[in-house]
Curated annotation (Swiss-Prot):
Keywords: Exopolysaccharide synthesis, Transferase. This is Capsular polysaccharide phosphotransferase XcbA. Part of a group II capsule biosynthesis locus. Part of a 3 gene operon, deletion of which prevents synthesis of the bacterial polysaccharide capsule. Capsule is important for the resistance of N.meningitidis serogroup X to killing by normal human serum. In Serogroup X the casule is a polymer of (alpha 1-->4)-linked N-acetylglucosamine 1-phosphate. This protein is probably the capsular polymerase. Coiled coil: none annotated.
Amino acid sequence: MIMSKISKLVTHPNLFFRDYFLKKAPLNYGENIKPLPIETSSHSKKNTAHKTPVSSDQPIEDPYPVTFPIDVVYTWVDSDDEKFNEERLKFQNSSTSETLQGKAESTDIARFQSRDELKYSIRSLMKYAPWVNHIYIVTNGQIPKWLDTNNTKVTIIPHSTIIDSQFLPTFNSHVIESSLYKIPGLSEHYIYFNDDVMLARDLSPSYFFTSSGLAKLFITNSRLPNGYKNVKDTPTQWASKNSRELLHAETGFWAEAMFAHTFHPQRKSVHESIEHLWHEQLNVCRQNRFRDISDINMATFLHHHFAILTGQALATRTKCIYFNIRSPQAAQHYKTLLARKGSEYSPHSICLNDHTSSNKNILSNYEAKLQSFLETYYPDVSEAEILLPTKSEVAELVKHKDYLTVYTKLLPIINKQLVNKYNKPYSYLFYYLGLSARFLFEETQQEHYRETAEENLQIFCGLNPKHTLALKYLADVTLTSQPSGQ
């Protein structure tokens, strides 16, 4: 011990005298000063009450707010539009692509059908993400019948605004998605939605982007099959494999990870870089009127992998419920989602997909069940919708026998299909239109009133089969239509 102290004095005199004087006159920190907890390894028996992990695998929460504007972009089509269907069939029948003819899902009408999902998706945005800066709806020129075009938060963007005329008309979502970044006035940060995707709980801007502007991209465990594209692949796999080959040739990275069927945060500058790198290949894709083997999946595959590889995005997870509305299991999914609404078990989003119309095992009344679910989960009318008259407002007019006013007010609403005939909460509109038409027929004996009364009372009674007064009125107008002597 003495030799070690002598050695310390010779080699480190400063430390020797420091320790000597501290022992003679220790520092006094005062009675209120307590020692800090000592971080020890998990094997130490000392100070176990104060063990603190030095590192953690948990991500650090971004302490800074997202302050930049975030837009939302939808793609939408109205399959009930006669002009649209005429053009679709014309180009579909004139297609010479062997791969197109062998892929029913490329042209199947289910891909284009609209059941007002867009209306409910916007309702979900207004309720669960009211911070959204602006909403753009990209269409082939159609306008949703329920949309209030005077609303300043929603803008319709025709295909002709963002796609060169040589590639129009197009019925290929990959073509449309490749040009979304060209929307005039679009913010650098935006979220791409299909019209069948809805939010299911409150989400903040930081769920989609970091405060520094990185996009958060929602990765899954699914993998794009290895190997190059072949005729057995789906059209989505064709487009994703083509995108993978472009990415591999440029970066050496072989992309396999797929992303969730949900919302897709986007960076406009990433799309501009992709256009600059692969303009020629994108234009080959844009020549395809329908999904085809030379497509590129820009919005939900190429953008995502390129953004992550170039440090403009990061991969993360989300909770998304995705199912086919025609599936027999859909009814149970609706019940589960409604039961979990507002709880911690609610998903972040719902994707109500419609697979090919050739599906043989189909849920009975699947359209009515879908409408019932949507109206129950998203009952609050958004500011983007044309306001419908309330039940009490119409009843007051009927009370004063102002049948012509009721008729002229409700007929355009029903004719424009602002209300779906499967939507029971709004069935009163069919009832009062039928009722007013019934009394107008009684007064004037004009056949078109009787036909309107019969048609709308039938719809109402189908949804409300025990409504005795409606059944009586329906019987009256139906009997009147029978030729005398029968």
